[in-house]
Amino acid sequence: IRPAALCAAANRSFALYRSRKEAHVHAEAMRTALTEQYSAMADALSVLSEQLGRPGNPEPYKSGRVAAFFASLGTPPLECAVTLDDLGRTRAAVTLPRTRFSSPELAALAQETGRICRRDFDPPQVLSCKGMTTLLFCEKPALRAVFGTAGTAAKGTVSGDAVQQFCSPAAAQMILCDGMGTGRPAAVDGSLAAELTARLLKAGFTAELAARLVNVALALKSDEESGATLDLISVDLYTGTARIFKAGAAPGFLVHGGRARPVGDISLPIGILGGVNGQSRVVHLAAGDYAVLVSDGLLVDGPGWVAKQLELSAAAGDPPEKVARILVETARARAEQ
């Protein structure tokens, strides 16, 4: 027996076995991720097709009057449709030969089209494609969203937090993602999760479906484990209904009637498991309320002081940008004590 040769052969055999085992595990993970991705896409397409299948109840009289108005301006529409959706909201879509409009012109068109339809319209969304311009008029929502954000990284580090805030035609969306770990890899994961979630929401995906697709994207991003928390709130600006979705995120806060309360349960981040273990909740917001998303770094001393500060800010009527700045500055001061 030659011990050295035997050990070398055993090492080679074990290395080959381990390599094959890792390849098998990686292939299995890829199959699971792709299956989850296709399943999420199928569910998303089902939801989108259902939405497209409910275009609303047509209102031919108003459609004719709106078409006549545009014709009187010297731009007879190629198509004109005024519809009433299931929630009683009036929408108008006018397709014209490709035309450029200034902001004052769009505001004037919205005012006159709204007068014809007996509704208060926002300036229309303008879509241009293949020599045509489509103007999409929607009713002004009952609520208006005002955003604010503030953040800071620990000394000598890069923050893994990423924020997206925007309004879609019917809802205000706010996203906060915190990449797992520290440094630039965490920042990359957080930014990827926030940006991809925002793009999916703008395309009409629900929070749950967006989370499933982002989960797959993080899982397939690299051979190393990638993960991020997902904190999302979507507020219907017509009804005030707010849908909160959290996956691994720190508790948020709602300020209603001047009283602050934490919201959110314990869950796992996205990107570390084959599925998404998120928590959903529906609440109602009114004018003057605050919805606050925070990362775990703000809660090192617990949520009590945050709730008290939010109630003070609500009593003073502070704008969201000021509220966010006060919370971050106070958290930093408390951490340095």
Over which residues does each language-model region extend?
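Active-site-proximal, acidic helix/loop segment immediately C-terminal to a metal-coordinating Asp/Glu
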Residues: 179-203, 266-274, 285, 289-335
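Catalytic core of PPM/PP2C metal-dependent serine/threonine phosphatase domains
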Residues: 57-88, 108-110, 114-131, 187-257, ...
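PP2C/PPM family metal-dependent serine/threonine protein phosphatase catalytic domain
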Residues: 139-161, 211, 215-221, 250-282, ...
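N-terminal entry segment of metal-dependent catalytic domains or homologous docking segments
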Residues: 128-180, 185, 191-195, 278-281
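Generic detector of multi-pass transmembrane helix bundles and their immediately adjacent loops
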Residues: 226, 232, 243-246, 251, ...
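Short hydrophobic/glycine-rich mini-motifs in sensory/regulatory modules
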Residues: 87-91, 142-144, 169-173, 286-290, ...
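Soluble C-terminal extramembrane regulatory/interaction domains of multi-pass membrane proteins
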Residues: 1-117
